[in-house]
Amino acid sequence: MPYLDLSPDFKPYYEIHDATDPWTRPQTIVFVHGFTESTEAFRAWVPYLSRQYRVVTYDLRGFGRTAPVDSDFTYSTELYVDDLVRVINHLAGEPVHIVAFKSGGISTMRLAATRPDLVRSITLACPPMVAPGGADWQPFMEAHGMRAWARKTMPSRLGKDAPPRAIDWWTDLMGATSITTARAYLRWVGTTEAGKDMPAITCPTLVILTKLSEQTNVAAGQVPPETVQKGMPHAEIKLLDLDCYHPAASHPDLCAPVMLSFLQKLA
């Protein structure tokens, strides 16, 4: 399995999907997943994009096949940005398009704000503009385990009409995260305010949102689309009439074509 040897404590698992014509020089898309996810979260998106773009996915520090971290590990937005910079430099070597799911948008927005030289565009799928995370998440994880937490929170994540087998699959994926990583991540993510980076972002930006409601968005850190538009007047906003806060997972066949159309307009 491919791993990047970036530092003694960060050797991320990664995948490259490239179905472009071998005589062309495609641009690169880098995916950044959210809490308790991995490269597997992008599997339905890759076929839409890999015929025209070189697609890079990787497991963030602490998640998937990248090594877990200890409970007392100190996550920070700056650390995740540095990790992302090193992945881009090693696997692309030039500016990239970035697609971020949920809290993956925190480091993506900071990178776009502070290192515009590395970013062609960003696509943010339901990013948390204020601190995400339910107050009862960690106590429930500690009492019942990661898999039970994943299943309990799945209806708001995927929507009330999500097929049972989809709920099972995402529960297995997200429930595999180490409780030590979850403790460290939640301690960090609860302090973030990604929305403050919006005014500094100038690259082409697509934001995919779902309708705001307490039921679906209280734990996701989302804000009304008007707030996003005010913070990033240049952004293209796609508002989906769905009762979930993770449409990139629940409705990839809606979201991925929107993103592909957005990129094609930049060409």
What are these regions (language model features)?
Residues M1-V30, R51-R54, A176, E236, ...:
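Alpha/beta-hydrolase fold catalytic core
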Residues S7-F10, D21, E40-S50, V56-V99, ...:
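Active-site loop/oxyanion-hole signature of alpha/beta-hydrolase fold enzymes
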Residues P26, G34-E37, K102:
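Active-site glycine-rich loops that stabilize anionic/oxyanionic intermediates
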Residues F31-G34, T57:
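Structural cue for short, hydrophobic secondary-structure segments
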Residues T36, L60-G64, M129, C244-P247:
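Alpha/beta-hydrolase active-site loop signature
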Residues I106-T114, L118-A148:
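Flexible "cap/lid" loop of the alpha/beta hydrolase fold
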Residues H144-A200:
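Conserved alpha/beta-hydrolase catalytic His-Asp/Glu region
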Residues T202-L254:
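Conserved loop-alpha-helix segment in the C-terminal half of the alpha/beta-hydrolase fold
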